[in-house]
């Protein structure tokens, strides 16, 4: 969360997008959809069509790909990215995973979803994305991660990704964050894995996750530092 706040104070976004902020977004509640609509609607001045809070796909592929390999699914492994925004996690998995994946990115900002669908299909001057495995697929849908009933049935995903979504939702109160966690665990396969990426210290995050995911195993791995900031991957796993 501290990293999100620091980046909101920057006059322009890095990693190729370089989008200047209009107004003082740093003082807004990160659980407010209007804030994210405004962010995602800003012009992209760089050549990179995605923007990542914290870090991108390249920094965590060493963690994600072994999980896909270990699953050894007979059909494409179903992956859900909650609060995907315009991140490269979904597109990176789709275009670079040597293992077949069926990736769904959901976000409560229709602006973000429209942008990612345009990127996937190949908008003006863009080439459609190509899968890293011929059996892989990628979709984006408009949905609130705290209520996934319209897009996901119980136990339907083997891997769930949450990069900063808990952090943002928790700004609206911890009950909302627990609602997010509960819904993620509902749609997660009992043998699957939920990964929360955050810069929040384990002393703060682990007690919350352990309280909200009883019956699941919660572990943490340190990531980075990336651009001088240490991050953490919080893994919530069922029986394997």
UniProtKB/Swiss-Prot annotation:
A Gene Ontology molecular function term of the record: protein-lysine N-methyltransferase activity
Keywords from the named record: Methyltransferase, Mitochondrion, S-adenosyl-L-methionine, Transferase, Transit peptide
A GO biological-process term: peptidyl-lysine monomethylation
Major subcellular site: mitochondrion
The keyword S-adenosyl-L-methionine belongs to this UniProt entry's keyword annotation: yes
Broad class of enzyme this protein falls into: transferase
Segment annotated as transit peptide: 1-21
Reaction it catalyzes: L-lysyl-[citrate synthase] + S-adenosyl-L-methionine = N(6)-methyl-L-lysyl-[citrate synthase] + S-adenosyl-L-homocysteine + H(+); N(6)-methyl-L-lysyl-[citrate synthase] + S-adenosyl-L-methionine = N(6),N(6)-dimethyl-L-lysyl-[citrate synthase] + S-adenosyl-L-homocysteine + H(+); N(6),N(6)-dimethyl-L-lysyl-[citrate synthase] + S-adenosyl-L-methionine = N(6),N(6),N(6)-trimethyl-L-lysyl-[citrate synthase] + S-adenosyl-L-homocysteine + H(+)
Entries under Gene3D superfamilies matching the protein: Vaccinia Virus protein VP39 (3.40.50.150)
Segments traversing the membrane: none
Domain of life according to the entry: Eukaryota
InterPro entries: Lys/N-term_MeTrsfase_sf, Methyltranfer_dom, SAM-dependent_MTases_sf
Activity modulation: Citrate synthase-lysine methyltransferase activity is inhibited by S-adenosylhomocysteine (AdoHcy) and oxaloacetate (OAA).
Gene Ontology terms: cellular component: mitochondrion
Pfam families, alphabetized: Methyltransf_31
Record EC number: 2.1.1.-
Alphabetized SUPFAM superfamilies for the sequence: S-adenosyl-L-methionine-dependent methyltransferases (SSF53335)
Transmembrane helix is among the record's keywords: no
PANTHER family associated with the record: CITRATE SYNTHASE-LYSINE N-METHYLTRANSFERASE CSKMT, MITOCHONDRIAL, SAM-DEPENDENT METHYLTRANSFERASE SUPERFAMILY PROTEIN
Free-text function comment from the UniProt entry: Protein-lysine methyltransferase that selectively trimethylates citrate synthase (CS) in mitochondria. Seems to conduct trimethylation in a highly distributive manner rather than in a processive manner, and thus introduces a single methyl group per binding event.
Name of the protein in its database record: Citrate synthase-lysine N-methyltransferase CSKMT, mitochondrial
Species of origin: Pongo abelii (Sumatran orangutan)
Originating gene: CSKMT
């Amino acid at each position: 969360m501290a990293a999100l706040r620091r980046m909101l104070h920057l006059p322009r976004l890095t990693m190729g997008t370089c989008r200047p902020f209009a107004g003082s977004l740093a003082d807004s509640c990160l659980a407010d959809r209007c804030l994210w609509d405004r962010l995602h609607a800003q012009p992209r001045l760089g050549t990179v069509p995605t923007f990542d809070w914290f870090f991108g796909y390249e920094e965590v592929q060493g963690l994600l790909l072994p999980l896909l390999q270990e699953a050894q699914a007979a059909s494409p492994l179903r992956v859900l990215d909650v609060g995907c925004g315009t991140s490269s996690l979904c597109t990176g998995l789709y275009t670079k995973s040597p293992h077949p994946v069926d990736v769904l990115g959901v976000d409560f900002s229709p602006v973000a979803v429209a942008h990612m669908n345009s990127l996937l299909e190949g908008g003006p001057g863009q080439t459609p994305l190509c899968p890293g495995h011929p059996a892989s697929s990628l979709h984006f849908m408009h949905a609130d991660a705290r209520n996934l009933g319209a897009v996901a049935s119980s136990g339907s995903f083997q891997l769930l990704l949450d990069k900063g979504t808990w952090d943002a939702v928790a700004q609206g109160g911890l009950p909302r964050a627990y609602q997010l966690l509960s819904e993620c665990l509902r749609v997660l396969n009992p043998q699957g894995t939920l990964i929360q990426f955050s810069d929040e210290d384990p002393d703060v995050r682990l007690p919350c996750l352990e309280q909200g995911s009883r019956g699941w195993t919660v572990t943490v791995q340190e990531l980075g530092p990336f651009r001088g900031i240490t991050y953490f991957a919080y893994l919530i796993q069922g029986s394997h």
